[in-house]
Amino acid sequence: MTNPVYRSARAAESIAAQYRRVLERWPVARTELHVPTRQGSTFVIACGPETAPPVVLLHGSQANSAAWMPDVPLWSRKFRLFAVDMIGEPGLSAPVRPDLAGDAHALWLDDVLVGLGLSHAAFVGTSLGGW
C-alpha cells in the first residue's frame, strides 16, 4: 500500500470506521458531501441554514472535521458551515499529501469552493488549516 497518511490498509479502514462512528454524534443536522477535486475526492460536512452566510472550516494536521464538533452548535445557528476534511490527513478525503511548498493546496481549495458553489466565504482555520 502506498498511502502517505496510513501505514497499512487495515489502519486506514480502522480510522475511517472510528471517524464515521464519531460523525454519528455530530451535534446538529448535517449533509455529507463528496466534492471532486484535482487531488481526488474531498469529504465535506455541511450544516446550518442553507441561506446563511457561508463559513469554511479547515482543521489542523493529524485531525479531521470532528475537531469542529464543540463549535458547531453555536456557529451553525447563524452560518452555513462547511467543515472540510483536508487532503492528506486522517479523515475521509483523498489520502494524498502534496508538497506544502507548492500551489497544490491552493488549487485544491479552489476546486473545493467551486464544487460547493461558493463564490465567497469566510474561513476559520487552525494550525495547518490556518495557512
Question: Where are these predicted regions, by residue range?
Answer:
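Short beta->alpha connector loops
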Residues: 38-40, 61-64, 128-130
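Active-site loop/oxyanion-hole signature of alpha/beta-hydrolase fold enzymes
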Residues: 83-128
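Generic alpha-helical hydrophobic packing signal
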Residues: 30, 40-42, 65, 81-84, ...
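Alpha/beta-hydrolase fold catalytic core
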Residues: 1-54, 78-79, 118-119
